[in-house]
Amino acid sequence: MIWPLPEPPVSERWRAWPVSQIFPETVPGVSPSGARVTYVLAGVAPEAPCRTAFQLAALRRGCRVALRATYADSTQTFVATVGIAVLDSPWSGSYRAGRLATVRPVAFPRGPAERFGERQYFTGVVVGSHENYMVATAAGYTDGRPYQPGDRVLPRLRDTARQLATALYRALTR
């Protein structure tokens, strides 16, 4: 009889889990109207130093490494980069949203995220509590439109950022 391997401690999952478990191919969500939404993985970036992966004001003391992936909604209207900061000790922050300092967007060629960059991110979310991870998102439009101060953020775009950050944080820390 083969016994199942024990689940790795939460603080080691970033290293022990396969990338497909940290960043699954699809993440389910719900639109503001209650319709089902699916976020589809556009690509996974290589591990990066925290200073490269996060905007300076988003950096947290004790950040060891950053993991990033970009998702698009199934209509290929919205795109969001999810960044996971692996920390030396639990983060005592809380949920924050808006156009705050966050993860640096990652574009992937020949797909819905090919025109996504720092000028294209409209909104983001930072999630974390009492674990060695902080999860941040930066969300924008797949058409590459740049953010202009005063631009209105659609509820669906805001939900994209929130749902991806929350779902991936919960999966990693459950």
Go through the PLM ranges and name each one:
Residues 12-20, 88-122, 172:
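Ampipathic, surface-exposed secondary-structure segments
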Residues 59-98, 104:
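Mid-length scaffold segments of soluble, non-membrane domains
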Residues 50, 54, 62, 92-99, ...:
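Stable alpha-helical elements in mature extracytoplasmic
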Residues 27, 43, 75, 82, ...:
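Solvent-exposed, flexible loop/coil residues
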Residues 108-174:
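Extracellularly exposed regions in secreted/surface proteins, prominently low-complexity, repeat-rich
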